[in-house]
Each structure stands twice: as C-alpha cells, then as structure tokens.
Design a protein with these regions (language model features):
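Bacterial N-terminal signal peptides that target proteins for export
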Residues: 2-13
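Basic/polar N-terminal segments that are highly enriched at the extreme N-terminus
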Residues: 4, 25-27
Length: 335
C-alpha cells in the first residue's frame, strides 16, 4: 500500500509506512529499475543512485493530469476561499490549480496562452513549482516516477524517460542529463486572493471527482512533524528543519528567508528581491480537511523597477530541510 495513494492516513500510520518504504527500497538500483520496465539511460547520471528512494507507488502510480479540465473561478462552489492554489497567469490567461487536487496527482501538464507548462507539487517538501516544459524546441510531458530524492518528487519525461528533480527542474538521470526546465513565476495563494486578482480566471477541477478524496489531506499533521520523512541528509542549523522558508532561485542569486521572519516584518528586501506576506491561506498539510488548515499566509516575490513597476519572479515556500539539502552552502536568513 502506497503512503501517497492512501485515502487518509494518521501521523503514526504515515511514519510506519515511510519506514517500511525506506527499508524496502533503499537498495534499489538500475538493474531493478530496468526490470520494472524503465527505458531510462542509467549510464548518464549526476547523482548517486543510493540517493533515490521509493515513496511506494510505481511509475505513474500517482497519475499526472494530462488533459486538465477548468471552469470559471466565479462558478466555483467546491474549493474554500482560503484553500491554497498554485496560480499562474500568462498573457492574460490566469489559472488556479488547487492543492486539494495536486496533493493527489503532483503534476499537471497544461498549455496556457500557447505555452506548454507543467505545474507540480511535492507534498513531502510542500514545494509548488511551475515550469515551461519545452526543452531545446521539444515539448515534454511529465509523469511521476514514484521515487524521491532528498524527500523531493522525481519526475520523468515520457519522450526519453529521463528523471528530473522537481525542486531544481534539472534532469539528473538519462538522456536529458544536464538539461534544465525554466521556472515560471507561479504563486501559491488562497483561492480568494486569486479570485480577487483574476475575477475572470479559471480553476482546475477533477477529471473524475470520485477518483480521490479531493479536499482531504493524506498527510495529516505533516508540517508539524519533528523531522522530515524519507530524508537522511544533514539538517539546517539554527532553524527547525520543518519550518517554512521562502526560497528564491533565479539567474542572479539563490537564497532563503524564514517565513516566520517575513510574517513578522510583512515586507522584506534581500539581494534585490522584495518579499511580502499577507494572511489568508490555509496549510494543505495540517488538518485532514484542507479547508480547515491553519493560516500560513501568502507570499509574493518581485523585483522592483522604475516608476513603481514590479516584475514577479519564481519562488517557492518549502521546508528548511529541502532548501538546505539542495543548497547546503547557502544560509537561511532567520533574522
């Protein structure tokens, strides 16, 4: 039984399931993966295969959404106003992807205003990132491998079956090794905030409303856990590994700021980037009912220009251990 396909799970059951998964799959390597049907070129890798663990599901066991269905956000009656959504707007086409859906599917392959995009969410990292899914002129479709590295979702493209790290957007195994996906300036915000900014926007709805228990959180209490699951790396210093941080990774700089600090200051400038925080967004990883989760607020990130112009930039509200795992030489600003 997969911890990421359970209809609901208690913290104790989740811990047991993860310990079983870690024990069962710690020795997985290319020979076994090939027996599972993978056509990946495992001779090309930038990582140690021992870093890869299985979260339980097989390839595509967590099904991506490849033919997304939307309805006008004004017609929504299912998603609560404070529930978290990943929002992305391109050339006036604004779309909201509720975490109540993404928590069960993790990947949505979509096209917005002619741009092929993939919208992703890794629950164990609380990492919500959108990418342009074009690489060297080729449009890729992404699926779930069922595997994790540093507790983070490992995706694969269906053209070459190369494996991609969701948190970085980089191909880590296979023919596409060394290629990177361009991150897009998506925002994790409440549905109410999205609706205010984009009253004519669209919201993703389930292809099959009975396929999963949409609106329910299968990781109850995870963001209050003492330590992360399926992670054996070093922990960040001076901050709880499960504390939320705002991670900025653009062409000029990579840094992280503790969400608690931003929440206290409301507005904070760092390395030329302005961050803001406002209340009104539920945690998707707190209570069983996502709509009842505690308020963790909404972050925006932008670069200020001339005449009060602002340019949104990609950011991520993730856990401190995740940023540390992928950027061990970077410090997290806590004061």
């Amino acid at each position: 039984m997969s911890l990421r396909t359970l209809p609901t799970i208690t913290p104790l059951a989740l811990t047991c399931a993860i310990m079983m998964a870690a024990t069962s799959f710690a020795t997985a390597e290319p020979t076994q993966w090939k027996r599972q049907g993978w056509k990946t070129d495992f001779s090309k890798t930038s990582i140690k295969f021992a870093e890869i663990l299985s979260g339980g599901p097989p390839k595509d066991g967590i099904p991506s959404i490849d033919q997304p269905i939307f309805k006008p956000v004004a017609a929504n009656t299912d998603v609560g106003g404070k529930e978290p959504v990943v929002s992305l707007a391109i050339d006036g086409d604004a779309r909201a992807y509720p975490l109540r859906i993404l928590i069960w599917h993790e990947i949505v392959n979509d096209t917005i205003a002619g741009m092929p995009v993939t919208v992703t969410y890794c629950p164990l990292c609380n990492s919500a990132i959108a990418f342009d899914r074009r690489v060297d002129g080729q449009t890729l479709d992404f699926g779930t491998t069922g595997k994790l590295r540093n507790s983070d979702l490992v995706m694969y493209d269906r053209a070459t079956e190369s494996w991609w790290q969701q948190f970085t957007g980089e191909a880590i195994v296979g023919e596409m090794l060394g290629k990177s996906l361009k991150m897009l300036p998506a925002r994790l915000e409440s549905l109410g905030q999205f609706k205010t900014r984009h009253p004519d926007g669209k919201i993703l709805v389930p292809n099959n409303p009975t396929m999963r228990r949409y609106g329910q959180n299968p990781y109850v209490g995870y963001d209050s856990a003492a330590k992360p699951f399926l992670y054996s790396g070093s922990m960040p210093e001076g901050i709880n590994p499960m504390a939320r941080v705002v991670a900025i990774r653009n062409a000029d700089t990579s840094f992280a700021v503790a969400l608690s600090l931003l929440r206290e200051k409301r507005t904070l400038a760092h390395a030329g980037v302005t961050l803001t925080w406002q209340p009104g967004q539920n945690s998707a990883l707190d209570t069983q009912n996502i709509g009842s989760g505690r308020d963790v607020g909404t972050v925006s990130a932008f670069i200020a220009g001339a005449n009060d112009a602002t340019t949104p930039i990609p950011y991520d509200v993730t856990f401190a251990f995740v940023f540390h795992a992928f950027h061990p030489n970077r410090t997290i600003r806590i004061k």
